[in-house]
Amino acid sequence: DGTMTSEISARIAKAGGVFAAMPRNVFAIRAMAKSVKLRVYSASVLAVLLYGSETWNITAADTKRLESFHNRCLRCMFGISRLTHFTNFDLRKLTDQQTIESKIMTNRLRWLGHVMRMPEERMPKRMMFTRLQTARPQGGTRQRWKDCVQHDLRAMGLEDGWSHLVQQRDKWHSATQG
């Protein structure tokens, strides 16, 4: 059907499996430093959850499902009950974590930079700039990857001059970090 919903469901299921497979008390150890817990979580659970996210064009509903899973994991890791009045904003502040949406945005822009620096004859670069000759259907057309990237560039304030900035890898990297 052209949506990412089934892929998102699979990613959440796989990441949930990784989280559940962690040794029972790895995240429950109070003496373990917050930074260590977050590094383990990032290297294992988030890596599985966001695998391939640089190519996703997801809906707001899919983003909400990913955010919800991420917040549930963080709450579990730090022993924060859902009954406690602790907002998701407070949770991100405590854990110094970005939203999943901004992580996906960063991944998409990183991939854009990688492809833009490729030689012209490389297939990913050729495909990025290929236009299909068929018209898009009217009404309710789905957002394309290119549309997501345009939104990401606007959100990062990189609408103007990004095509020159992208050629300077270090500057592009620091400009696109959420």
Language model: regions and residue ranges:
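Short linear motifs embedded in intrinsically disordered, charge-biased segments
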Residues: 1-178
